[in-house]
């Protein structure tokens, strides 16, 4: 059971006052009056019943019925019977008990659910929100129960309302019955079969007047024949009447004035090349006023066309009178009806207009037939399309139908009738109608021949207006001269030839505008052919086929065939454009022609380079950013249009990796640009790491275009190789952080040498095969000496590197010479310099270092990641530099040099020790010390410590080498002392334990270069166990120190025994007494001193040997006394 709201229950009470059929709101009195007017009875319990607005008897009505207590009754066979009861409505009425039960259950359910929810949310919600929720529920229930209360109050009077609902329903049904009765009565008037025909008033009048009816005879009554005289008389009268009528007509059409003839009772109008028509009149009335024309109009007699199809030529001809076209019978009858109607309404003016249009339309029909024939059986097959619109008297001819420019009716010719009703044409192309085309008299064969032979004048740049075909006027159609046969083929030839010529003119103008400095690139051979210069030595003929509209090359190559295909296909850049214009096509054609010129010129250069031994690399593709690096060298040359510039990369077999010759060919001219570049692939992209434009001789640079002959390509490899070698040398100088000035010309290099007062020594020992071989290349680079190459005090701030390339036995050799000033050389070092195999002229303060590099082997070695060409010569320079510095320092410190070579120097330490060998650094290496096989282990250990120190030092200065040498002189007495102690122990230490182990052992420990420990191990056995060996250690430390109070710069030795002062060594008290006693007995008569500082002693290095021997003897004495 669905829930009803109080509003739903009250709806029936409102419907009591709503009339459903008319949708009008009625009050209670109106409803009562309607009841009284439409029912057979009166309203019950009314004292004043109403009938048609007037009071009536309460026991009777105006229809003869009676009402009693609201219930109708009638008499049947004299018996009074009750009318049927009004039907009771029970639909959509719900018992009140059901509503009360539902609301009670719903209220109980909502209260129960709310109480359960509130009990479960006691901990999660505060009391105020829970109370508010419960209050809202009670308020909503209260509102529902108020509605229930209202419903109960309303139900107390529900019986009366139910009667009103039944009464309203009965009213509606009675209203429906009365409407149906009205419709039925109205249908009685439409019974046509029951109607009588109208009276024949006309026949009645005729009988009344003539006393007989006028009935047709149906040719049953024969008519007498008309005599010839009567006929001639009538025709003569008609001729006279027609002459008079024609003389009195003021608005006779212009072309009818002198082109008519009156004979045989009719007027013959003959319009040359179009038609002939004859008309007459039905009586002899003379019409003087136009308003009286209807009294005697003209009637149509005969018609024929004065043109037709010539069976010999299949063309439309006018000149042969025998070739006329008569209409079929059905067409003639149809035309007769139309012409008579036109003559009645519009007279002769309307006749001319009608027949002129008819003739032109028939010409168009014949043209359409001719078009259909030539589109199938001629050269125009598959090249034209046409539409014949008969209703508009219009023919559309789409020429070049296979060409994308004209496909889908983008270029066509309209053949139709202009505003003077003459046969004319319009030309639609490039999205608009072409009005200034310069073609006239297209339907005159003589004019067509003249135009096909004559060239058109220059076209005016006037945009055509969108006009209808009827607004066009051609002067030639006003000419009444007899035209020749009309040929659609010739008309199409005129149009397509004109269009082709206009396209070629546009292409030529665009090319000349684009290549303004290349006038010889394009020239006309004929109006449909252009001569294009693709390379300095090759040209091609570019033409258009007027029949199809396609372009082609004469005697094309494969690449030209590809370009032809692109030209005759719509460009992909314009496929999404809503309209593809002629300018777009011309732009695409010019772009393709310039691209062809670019490809052909590039191919010619590519063939010459490959023939010369170059290898083309097609893998390298530069992005825009890298390409700009090349354009920076062009100094204003047009390099922006990358679509018409092509860059190719080449290399020679003997070149290093990543080096390429870059060639740029411009499509706008015949200029070429050349670079040498190093290009590498980094993360999938090609990057230019270095680039330099090639500079040719002065004659080539002054001309706009290089002469690409055999001499050019023969010298190109050498020029590029020289540039690569130069860059590799300069890059190597940069890597070594040597500053330089770029290579100098011979004249400028000579000036620099004179400025620095350097006289270059001529080469000696030149091989005979070199004298007859010219130098391939020679340059001089000035190096900046910042005291790293050579000491400035011994040289100058500038050195010179001379590079000379020669070719011997098919291999390229590079001769390097490094030279400059060299002065202030110590006299004692002259022999040392001679041992370095360097050419030094002390008298001229000059030196030079020579080296030879075989480039064929050097740069072709792919395993070498970075080719180093200057390693050898810079190594010699570095050796010379270090040697000068070291020898100068050794000479200043009076250090004796025993021997020297190109990579090492032997220094004398003292008379007893071995010589110290110092290895000079090579390139980025550092100084190192070399030990001989006869050195002691202690000396080898010291040398290893020193080499480690030198390797960890970022930069070793020459004074540090002097310090190392001085350290060796200071450490040598200690090394000798170690040897003496070992010798003493070997000689005097004879005491052994029971197991044969020596009671006294000695060892030396180097903690670092400044701390040396003399360790004495005392071995003894345990008292409880003779097998267990115990070992005690006595450590004597030696380290260098400086006496700050002594002005002499000499090192002293500090002897320390503090580490032995512990409780474990109390048993060795006697030993320490013996040690101190031995120290005090050391001889100091030679001026050396021993200074005691508590448990430490400061000793001169000269006394260390004797001191340590005394201490060792103390150990031996102590052990012997305890034995």
UniProtKB/Swiss-Prot annotation:
GO molecular function: transcription coregulator activity
A single BP term in Gene Ontology: regulation of transcription by RNA polymerase II
Domain of life where this protein originates: Eukaryota
A GO cellular-component term linked to this record: core mediator complex
UniProt keyword terms in alphabetical order: Activator, Nucleus, Transcription, Transcription regulation
Region ranges (Disordered): 450-484
A Pfam family per the record: Med14
Keyword Transcription regulation applies: yes
Subcellular location: Nucleus
Family the entry assigns: Belongs to the Mediator complex subunit 14 family.
Biological role stated in the UniProt entry: Component of the Mediator complex, a coactivator involved in the regulated transcription of nearly all RNA polymerase II-dependent genes. Mediator functions as a bridge to convey information from gene-specific regulatory proteins to the basal RNA polymerase II transcription machinery. Mediator is recruited to promoters by direct interactions with regulatory proteins and serves as a scaffold for the assembly of a functional preinitiation complex with RNA polymerase II and the general transcription factors.
Oligomeric form and interacting partners: Component of the Mediator complex.
UniProt-recorded name of the protein: Mediator of RNA polymerase II transcription subunit 14
Organism from which the protein derives: Debaryomyces hansenii (strain ATCC 36239 / CBS 767 / BCRC 21394 / JCM 1990 / NBRC 0083 / IGC 2968)
Taxonomic placement: Eukaryota, Fungi, Dikarya, Ascomycota, Saccharomycotina
């Amino acid at each position: 059971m669905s829930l009803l709201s109080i509003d739903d229950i009250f709806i029936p009470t409102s419907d009591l006052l709503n009339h459903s059929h008319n949708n009008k709101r009625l009050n209670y009195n109106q409803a009562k009056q309607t009841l009284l007017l439409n029912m057979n009875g009166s309203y019950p319990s009314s004292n004043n019943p109403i009938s048609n607005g007037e009071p009536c008897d309460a026991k009777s009505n105006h229809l003869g019925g009676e009402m009693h207590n609201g219930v109708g009754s009638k008499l049947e066979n004299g018996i009074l019977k009750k009318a049927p009861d009004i039907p009771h409505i029970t639909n959509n009425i719900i018992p009140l008990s059901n509503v009360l039960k539902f609301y009670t259950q719903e209220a109980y359910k909502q209260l129960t659910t709310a109480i359960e929810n509130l009990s479960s949310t006691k901990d999660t919600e505060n009391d105020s929100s829970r109370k508010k929720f419960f209050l809202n529920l009670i308020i909503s229930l209260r509102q529902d129960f108020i509605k229930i209360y209202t419903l109960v109050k309303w139900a107390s009077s529900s019986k009366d309302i139910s009667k009103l609902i039944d009464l309203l329903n009965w009213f509606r049904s009675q209203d429906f019955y009365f409407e149906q009765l009205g419709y039925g009565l109205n249908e009685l008037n439409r019974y046509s079969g029951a109607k009588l025909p109208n009276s024949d008033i006309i026949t009645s009048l005729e009988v009344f007047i003539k006393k007989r009816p006028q009935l047709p005879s149906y040719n049953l009554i024969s008519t007498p024949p008309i005599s010839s005289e009567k006929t001639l008389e009538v025709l003569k009268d008609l001729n006279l009447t027609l002459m008079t009528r024609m003389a009195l007509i003021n608005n006779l059409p212009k072309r009818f004035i002198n082109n008519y003839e009156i004979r045989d009772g009719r007027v013959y109008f003959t319009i040359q090349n179009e038609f002939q028509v004859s008309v007459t009149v039905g009586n002899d009335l003379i019409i003087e006023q136009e308003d009286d024309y209807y009294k005697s109009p003209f009637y149509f007699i005969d018609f024929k066309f004065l043109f037709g199809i010539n069976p010999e030529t299949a063309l439309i001809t006018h000149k042969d009178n025998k070739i006329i076209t008569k209409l079929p019978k059905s067409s003639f009858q149809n035309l007769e009806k139309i012409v008579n109607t036109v003559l009645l309404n519009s007279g002769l003016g309307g006749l001319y207009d009608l027949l002129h249009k008819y003739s032109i339309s028939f010409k168009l029909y014949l043209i359409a037939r001719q078009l259909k024939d030539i589109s199938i059986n001629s050269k125009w097959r598959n090249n034209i399309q046409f539409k014949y619109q008969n209703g508009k008297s219009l023919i559309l001819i789409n020429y070049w139908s296979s060409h994308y420019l004209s496909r889908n009716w983008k270029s066509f010719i309209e053949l139709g009738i202009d505003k003077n009703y003459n046969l004319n044409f319009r030309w639609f192309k490039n999205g608009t109608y072409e009005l200034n085309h310069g073609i006239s008299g297209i339907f005159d064969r003589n004019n067509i021949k003249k135009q096909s032979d004559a060239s058109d004048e220059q076209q005016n740049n006037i945009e055509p207006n969108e006009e209808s075909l009827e607004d066009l006027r051609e002067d030639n159609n006003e000419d009444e001269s007899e035209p020749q046969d009309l040929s659609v083929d010739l008309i199409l030839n005129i149009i397509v030839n004109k269009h082709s010529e206009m396209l070629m003119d546009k292409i030529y103008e665009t090319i000349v505008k684009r290549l303004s400095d290349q006038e010889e690139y394009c020239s006309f051979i004929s109006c449909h052919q252009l001569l294009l210069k693709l390379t300095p030595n090759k040209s091609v003929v570019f033409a258009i086929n007027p029949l199809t509209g396609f372009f082609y090359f004469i005697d094309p190559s494969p690449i030209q065939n590809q370009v032809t295909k692109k030209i005759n296909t719509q460009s992909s850049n314009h496929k999404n454009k809503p309209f593809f214009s002629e300018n777009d096509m011309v732009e695409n054609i010019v772009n393709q022609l310039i691209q062809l010129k670019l490809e052909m010129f590039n191919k010619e250069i590519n063939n010459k380079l490959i023939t010369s031994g170059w290898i083309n690399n097609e893998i390298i593709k530069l992005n825009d950013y890298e390409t700009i690096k090349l354009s920076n060298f062009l100094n204003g040359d047009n390099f922006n249009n990358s679509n018409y510039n092509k860059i190719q990369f080449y290399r020679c077999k003997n070149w290093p990796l990543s080096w390429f010759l870059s060639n740029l060919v411009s499509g706008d001219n015949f200029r070429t640009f050349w670079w040498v570049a190093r290009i590498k692939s980094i993360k999938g992209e090609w990057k230019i790491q270095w680039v330099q434009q090639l500079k040719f001789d002065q004659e080539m640079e002054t001309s706009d275009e290089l002469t690409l002959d055999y001499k050019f390509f023969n010298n190109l490899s050498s020029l590029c190789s020289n540039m690569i070698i130069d860059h590799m040398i300069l890059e190597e100088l940069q890597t070594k952080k040597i500053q330089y000035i770029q290579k100098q010309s011979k004249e400028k290099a000579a000036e620099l040498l004179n400025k620095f007062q350097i006289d270059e020594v001529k080469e000696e020992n030149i091989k005979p095969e070199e004298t007859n071989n010219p130098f391939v290349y020679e340059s001089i680079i000035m190096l900046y000496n910042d005291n790293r190459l050579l000491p400035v005090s011994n040289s100058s701030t500038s050195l010179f590197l001379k590079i000379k390339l020669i070719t011997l036995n098919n291999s390229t050799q590079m001769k390097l010479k490094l030279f400059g000033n060299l002065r202030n050389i110590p006299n004692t070092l002259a022999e040392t310099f001679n041992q370095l195999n360097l050419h030094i002229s002390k008298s001229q303060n000059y030196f030079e270092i020579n080296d030879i590099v075989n480039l064929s082997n050097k740069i072709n070695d792919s395993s070498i990641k970075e080719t180093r060409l200057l390693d050898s010569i810079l190594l010699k320079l570095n050796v010379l530099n270090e040697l000068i510095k070291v020898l100068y320092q050794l000479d200043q410190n009076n250090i004796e040099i025993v021997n020297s070579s190109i990579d090492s120097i032997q220094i004398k330490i003292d008379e007893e020790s071995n010589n110290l060998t110092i290895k000079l650094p090579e390139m980025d290496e550092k100084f190192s010390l070399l030990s001989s096989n006869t050195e002691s282990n202690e000396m080898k250990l010291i040398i290893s410590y020193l080499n480690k120190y030198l390797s960890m030092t970022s930069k070793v200065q020459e004074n540090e080498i002097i310090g190392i040498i001085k350290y060796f002189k200071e450490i040598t007495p200690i090394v000798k002392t170690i040897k003496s102690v070992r010798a003493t122990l070997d000689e005097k230490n004879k005491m052994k334990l029971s197991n044969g182990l020596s009671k006294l052992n000695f060892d030396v420990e180097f903690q670092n270069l400044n701390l040396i420990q003399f360790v004495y191990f005392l071995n003894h056995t345990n008292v409880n166990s003779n097998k267990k060996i115990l070992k005690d250690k006595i450590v004597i430390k030696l380290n260098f120190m400086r006496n700050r109070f002594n002005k002499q710069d000499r090192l002293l030795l500090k002897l320390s025994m503090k580490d032995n002062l512990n409780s474990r060594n109390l048993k060795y008290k006697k030993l320490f007494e013996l040690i101190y006693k031995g120290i005090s007995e050391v001889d100091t008569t030679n001026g050396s001193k021993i200074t005691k500082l508590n448990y430490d002693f400061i000793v001169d290095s000269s006394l260390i040997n004797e001191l340590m021997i005394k201490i060792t003897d103390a150990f031996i004495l102590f052990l012997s006394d305890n034995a």
